[in-house]
From Swiss-Prot:
InterPro entries: P-loop_NTPase (IPR027417), Small_GTP-bd (IPR005225), Small_GTPase (IPR001806), Small_GTPase_Ras-type (IPR020849)
Classification via Gene3D superfamilies: P-loop containing nucleotide triphosphate hydrolases
Name of the protein: Ras-like protein
Residues bearing a lipid moiety (S-palmitoyl cysteine): C209, C210
Name of the encoding gene: RAS1
PANTHER family linked to this entry: RAS, DI-RAS, AND RHEB FAMILY MEMBERS OF SMALL GTPASE SUPERFAMILY (PTHR24070)
DNA repair keyword on record: no
GO CC list: plasma membrane
Gene Ontology terms for molecular function: G protein activity; GDP binding; GTP binding; GTPase activity
Length: 216
């Protein structure tokens, strides 16, 4: 029986400071368009179905508040998340420094020494405003035993790759710690491939876009 006939659900949480582009990344991934102006997010949830590495994935994506006044909500979604995108803006040193705080909170809530995360350096289209160098993001991700991916929600650079990387990290983690959650698979015609052979390695990140997933 093909791997594509099994549907696994993954609870992804997008975390980061205010104004780093968490909602723009999420909406670009889910709906394939860029939202430039919107009210600060409190909490939005999206669902999207993909095939990643020949396995069906139902992604339940939670876009969270970055503002400090909503900090009390964080532990609640950190308890339920299976993988996290830790987002900062390359144009904001302070947002980069916040990433470690978010990561420490995740490990504390999960009571783990390691948990699946991907560090996402957003707004790479604003190179002329860069405050955080690429090697700094990579070095931080190494501390978390994670991958760092530079993205642009505006230009759709590495947006899909960032979400795919989190799913792959979750799968590796689940193989070590126990079986993943599964739900009934839909008809084959509803599925679209994401992350095929060209993206099999986690460190293969470029401007290619993987589209065509089903939004639920």
């Amino acid at each position: 029986m093909s791997k594509a006939q099994f549907l696994r659900e993954y609870k992804l949480v997008v975390v980061g400071g205010g104004g780093v582009g968490k909602s723009a990344l999420t909406i670009q991934f889910i709906q394939s368009h860029f939202v430039d102006e919107y009210d600060p997010t409190i909490e939005d949830s999206y669902r999207k179905q993909c095939i990643i590495d020949e396995e069906v994935a139902l992604l339940d994506v939670l876009d969270t508040a970055g503002q400090e006044e909503y900090g009390a909500m964080r532990e609640q979604y950190m308890r339920t998340g299976e993988g996290f995108l830790l987002v900062y803006s390359i144009t904001s040193r302070s947002s980069f420094e916040e990433v470690s705080t978010f990561h420490q909170q995740i490990l504390r809530v999960k009571d783990k020494d390691y948990f699946p995360v991907v560090v996402v350096a957003n707004k790479c289209d604003l190179e002329y405003e860069r405050q955080v160098q690429p090697h700094e993001g990579r070095d931080l991700a190494k501390r978390f035993n994670a991958q760092c991916i530079e993205t642009s929600a505006k230009q759709r650079v590495n947006v899909d790759e960032a979400f795919i990387a989190v799913v792959r990290a979750i799968r590796r983690y689940q193989k070590e710690s126990g079986p993943p959650q599964a739900v009934n698979a839909p008809a084959k015609s509803q599925m679209s491939a994401v992350g095929g052979r060209a993206a099999e390695k986690d460190d293969h990140v470029d401007k290619g876009c993987c589209r065509g997933c089903v939004v639920l």
